[in-house]
Amino acid sequence: MDLISHQPNKNPNSSTQLTPPSSSRYENQKRRDWNTFCQYLRNHRPPLSLPSCSGAHVLEFLRYLDQFGKTKVHHQNCAFFGLPNPPAPCPCPLRQAWGSLDALIGRLRAAYEENGGPPEANPFGSRAVRLFLREVRDFQAKARGVSYEKKRKRVNRQKPQTQPPLQLQQQQQQPQQGQSMMANYSGATV
């Protein structure tokens, strides 16, 4: 009886089959975001090529994505403007959350360079995009009554040792009449 089969191994867990390395969740999301942006450029009127894309086109894309948002952002004239938990529904629009837009821009910025775009011409890192994201963050924070202030690092405050006044320090450092410089160092007195 032949124990070794001469047929190809059909076991999916076998080490003889080559499987492509599984991509991380981040890489998959980055690829989907990149494909969505490229499709947006193709559907743009007139169609845009990637090298001709600028920060203004990225802003158009972000505004386009706003229609698919799920975050309620109150208008300034809404009665619930500035309330973190409004007590009733209102007609204010649903928008993309700032955190989602910020993460999206980060992924697209990386994807642009991975797909051959020069870092110095990256439209996702343009000043206009950075300013837009900052404005969205600040407005959404005001609309919800939440602040996004940067947390400052805590300074490790140790209680400073009290030091004698400068004149007293200088007097202690000068050798007394008849003492050597080493007398203060060793703690010996003459």
Curated annotation (Swiss-Prot):
Keywords: Developmental protein, DNA-binding, Nucleus, Transcription, Transcription regulation. GO terms for cellular component: nucleus. Residues 25-152 form the ALOG domain. Pfam families: ALOG_dom (PF04852). One of its GO terms (biological process) is response to light stimulus. It is found in: Nucleus. Residues 158-179 have a biased composition (Low complexity). A motif (Nuclear localization signal) lies at residues 150-154. InterPro entries: ALOG (IPR040222), ALOG_dom (IPR006936). This is Protein LIGHT-DEPENDENT SHORT HYPOCOTYLS 1. It comes from Arabidopsis thaliana (Mouse-ear cress). The gene is LSH1.
